[in-house]
Amino acid sequence: MSSRPPTPARPAATPAGLLARTALQALAAVVAGYLAMGVVAGLGLWAAGAADLPGGFTAVLAAVVVMATGGKVELSGDAGALAGTQAQLTAMPLTVTLVGALVTGYCFLRPLRHHAVTGARELLLRAGSVVVLWLIGLAGLSAVARHDFRITVGGGEAEDPLLDLFGELLDSVNPTVGFRTDLGPTLFYGLLWILGVLLIALLVSRRAPLPSRLVRYQEPVRPVAHAMLLLLLAYVLVGLVVGLVVAATRGRPADTFAVLFLGLPNITWLALGVGIGGSWEGRAEGPFGLPVPQILDAVLRGGSGGERADLSTVDLSSLAAQDGRAWWLLPVAAVLVLAAAFAAAVRSPARTRLRQHALRTGVAFALTMLVAAPVTLVEARFGLSVLGIGTLDSLGGEVLLRPHVWAVVGLALLWGLVLGLLGGLLASRVRRKGEVEQPVHREDGAGPPGPPGAP
């Protein structure tokens, strides 16, 4: 027997010590999240050429991070008494959003990884600390995200009669366009964003502890929630591979990397929705357009919107009319959604019935698309009118892309029910959680040996 004295038990943390440690951990999560978003947004803006903006790169970077958390950035313009400007921008750079959500969620859960269960008060304290610090950081970014740029109208190559007539006159009054952050809506949507990130982090984590009252919801919710996260990340990974191939084999790699760093999920999650039969509508007019594949830009400029001739419908058939390879979106969606359903079934308890798994998968997929489809919305407009009699086409344009949300959600529910059932059937051939191998008894009474001393 060892004569070494036993190690004394570590004293319990005092309330003040627990509060200080929780605050430091929350600060680390917030700083890591904002830092990751800033790095990704900075790389995307650099690839897009924003580093050449006269004194405005920092403000644009802050504005992109604000928009990535759901904040509202307002565009404004001033061209004196002779002209007016109209500007609007609604979009989320989802690559920045996704990276920030993953990093913040991971750092939020990391201190809890060794806990079997956690108290509701402790969980609320940790979440509340992250939320408060996140909103403080968002308010600081909002103060930085403001800048004005001067527009040079004359001397262009575009053949616009109004531009030729009024260009020099407008240059003399120094027309400008700028952006500001609307603090109230930014903090409100930022609050919803960070609460959603923390909630989703708890739902998709397979190891994070829950309060004892919520443990019973762990088995029916977490396997399918985790599988839906894997589905969204799988689409982003496929899009990343395709984007790298395009950057290596075609011209203008900087533009491709700008899309990868800023808006990759905007494209890949749209591809998921289109692949299951959903549709978007939109248009692209003027000299600028969406940083998207040429096939999508061609559809948006085609004006095939049926009764609403000014809008184009983006679905499988319209994309395939531009490039037949678009039909691959359908089998890719079938394979990846089935893989997600199978992964959820394997991680679910063996006692889960097929219809239960199908229903859970259908509801989870529908909720996933209820979140993923609306955030792909893009609305951007800018125009410069002279004396109210027209718009300078060389300095105006419009980009619109919005989903038919409820149609996409309904299709996701149907796909989840069908492929959830099929995934459960496939998983029934795999040993699953909670499954116990039954001993085999032979007619002669022989069987596996029992425990020592058993009769």
Predicted region positions:
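Cytoplasmic membrane-interface segments at the C-terminal ends of transmembrane helices
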Residues: 11-24, 102-127, 143-150, 195-227, ...
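Elongated alpha-helical scaffolds
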Residues: 90-102, 123-131
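Alpha-helical transmembrane segments
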Residues: 179-195
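Long, glycine/tryptophan/cysteine-rich extracytoplasmic
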Residues: 11-99, 143-182, 243-333, 371-447
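Long, low-complexity, intrinsically disordered segments
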Residues: 447-455
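A structural/positional concept
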Residues: 214-255
